[in-house]
């Protein structure tokens, strides 16, 4: 974590959280749509 001097930690956490929620949402949506097995 030496290269995070110019990037705020809260920004990294926010982007990471949004990405995780998006991936999780797509996975759940895919499971309900029946295409979750293709992932």
Curated annotation (Swiss-Prot):
Highest taxon, organism lineage: Eukaryota
SUPFAM superfamilies documented for this protein: Photosystem II reaction center protein J, PsbJ (SSF161021)
Gene3D superfamilies in alphabetical order: 6.10.250.2070
Annotated signal sequence range: none
Membrane topology label: Single-pass membrane protein
Keyword vocabulary terms for this entry: Chloroplast, Membrane, Photosynthesis, Photosystem II, Plastid, Reaction center, Thylakoid, Transmembrane, Transmembrane helix
A GO cellular component entry from the record: photosystem II reaction center
Xref: InterPro entries: PSII_PsbJ (IPR002682), PSII_PsbJ_sf (IPR037267)
One GO BP annotation of this record: photosynthesis
Pfam family, one: PsbJ
Primary site of residence: plastid
Transmembrane segments: 9-29
Compartment(s) of residence: Plastid, Chloroplast thylakoid membrane
Function of the molecule: One of the components of the core complex of photosystem II (PSII). PSII is a light-driven water:plastoquinone oxidoreductase that uses light energy to abstract electrons from H(2)O, generating O(2) and a proton gradient subsequently used for ATP formation. It consists of a core antenna complex that captures photons, and an electron transfer chain that converts photonic excitation into a charge separation.
NCBIfam families cross-referenced by the UniProt entry: PRK02565.1 (NF002722)
Family stated for the protein in its record: Belongs to the PsbJ family.
Subunit comment: PSII is composed of 1 copy each of membrane proteins PsbA, PsbB, PsbC, PsbD, PsbE, PsbF, PsbH, PsbI, PsbJ, PsbK, PsbL, PsbM, PsbT, PsbX, PsbY, PsbZ, Psb30/Ycf12, at least 3 peripheral proteins of the oxygen-evolving complex and a large number of cofactors. It forms dimeric complexes.
Name of the protein described by the UniProt record: Photosystem II reaction center protein J
Organism from which the protein derives: Pyropia yezoensis
Lineage, highest ranks first: Eukaryota, Rhodophyta, Bangiophyceae, Bangiales, Bangiaceae
